């Protein structure tokens, strides 16, 4: 490049050119991209390399397209005046309904198994409270079935020897009277008092209980009750579970109530139903239970209307004459509303139904959805819980706790508790094979209540579940006006199943329905999501630094790509120079003086030499006199070229 052209280009580059006064559109765009706040346009100009420029062009055009698209949607939405109307008829799935008779087995069917136990129970009541003729008010069939086969004078009582009943007097601490022998005995070990379920105005001074010991009788625990009712029933239930645990399942099903016996009439959603719509579920403590709308059905029934007319209506035959007087002290049935894949814990959360009454249960559905980790410690399906599910049902907290306890029971006591399902390769506890199981069970249960087994720490709440809020109301049924004809009709309808005339204390009416179809959903959502986090970051960067996504990309390019690239190049160049110096031997020759074009001070690629640099130049050799005259400089038209480019600059002042 000629020296004059270089001076012209240098001045043109250094002097600012204002936008509207740029001579060409290209210069105007160049100025705009260099001075605009739109980061993408600026990066297109200042980026070095074709690939980077193409990437910045793509980023910028994509951002412009998104802006145009979103703005167009906003404008169209603003000027749209149409109205949309949605009409939705909601239908709710009807839950599964499990119904059990409070009395698990017909007394006439199990009386042969319980004869000795019932006889000793009656003798205990006679000795403790002077109660005579416990079964005299019952029909003759029961009296015959419950006749005593052993007396005090005959064979010694087997059940009272296994678990002796004791009478405690507060005035004599540490001693108790054995009600069978009448002798006082010293009580060693722990004494655990269980509060009574019956309200007392004044606490009795006498306590009734029983003692459980290990095999060697060295370690014992005594359980006392303030009410004799609770003590007798708890003592009776322990022996009852031991006896029934040895009965095969098929025989127990035959000893309990069939669906045709339990269900007198059935209606759902205004349509007739029968025993075929119910599924048998055998519960260890409640016998044969029957589930309506179970998961084994082909389709899950639903309802499209609320109210008692569009739910489940059944009349139940309770058959009070077949009740075990020592096992249960109330008459009626138990009902539980639950999901189709949920195990019915009828003994824990079931609702009792009275006889001679119409029980209406209105339901309201609530669905809960919780967030799993890291927001909470819930589980989706229980796969992350280190407890084996021994129930043939979906995971729940209650299933996990009972499964954990049953597993611990098998590990510690060598057998399983009768009221829960069997773990793999386990057997139910009984006296013959496991004489120590009662003491072990009570000790383990106390540790479970005190949360010492670790079950409460490993079991987690389910993340999603359904819950039905129940509202119960009662009405006398049947009324005195309709009692006569209604009972006669029901007796005639059930003549094939029931060989007696029905009375109202044998029957119970149940209505289960949705109060309305309003479903409440409780859903957890994170208070700070990733979208909200990015939005907050963008708001802060835009407010304080006028920075956007393109600005962030620009920062990444400069400080994480270019910055380290420069450092890498410098280090590489230093390494190359060091290697070159190491391989090249030092020169002993005196360097020749550089003159003319070899002198770096006269490099035409730089600016003109200053006065100081010019003084250091060697004297120029004498040049021959040219044979031609010097050129005419006015013919180069330098003035016109400078004037056209520098019209608004103060060129005269700067030079």
UniProtKB/Swiss-Prot annotation:
Residue numbers covered by motif PY motif: 629-633
UniProt entry tagged with the keyword Acetylation: no
Cysteine disulfide links: 100-289, 213-220, 266-273, 378-463, 400-459, 404-455, 413-440, 415-429
Glycosylation site residues: 215, 277, 503
GO molecular function: ligand-gated sodium channel activity; sodium channel activity; WW domain binding
Activity regulation summary: Originally identified and characterized by its inhibition by the diuretic drug amiloride.
Description of post-translational modifications: Phosphorylated on serine and threonine residues. Aldosterone and insulin increase the basal level of phosphorylation. Ubiquitinated. Can be ubiquitinated at multiple sites and undergo monoubiquitination and polyubiquitination. Ubiquitination by NEDD4 or NEDD4L inhibits the ENaC channel through endocytosis, intracellular retention and degradation of its individual subunits.
Broad class of where this protein is predominantly found: membrane
Subcellular location: Apical cell membrane
Assembly and oligomerization: Component of the heterotrimeric epithelial sodium channel (ENaC) composed of an alpha/SCNN1A, a beta/SCNN1B and a gamma/SCNN1G subunit. Interacts with WWP1 (via WW domains). Interacts with WWP2 (via WW domains); inhibits the channel. Interacts with the full-length immature form of PCSK9 (pro-PCSK9); inhibits ENaC by promoting its proteasomal degradation. Interacts with BPIFA1; the interaction is indirect via SCNN1B and inhibits the proteolytic maturation of SCNN1A and SCNN1G and the activation of ENaC.
Record's protein name: Epithelial sodium channel subunit gamma
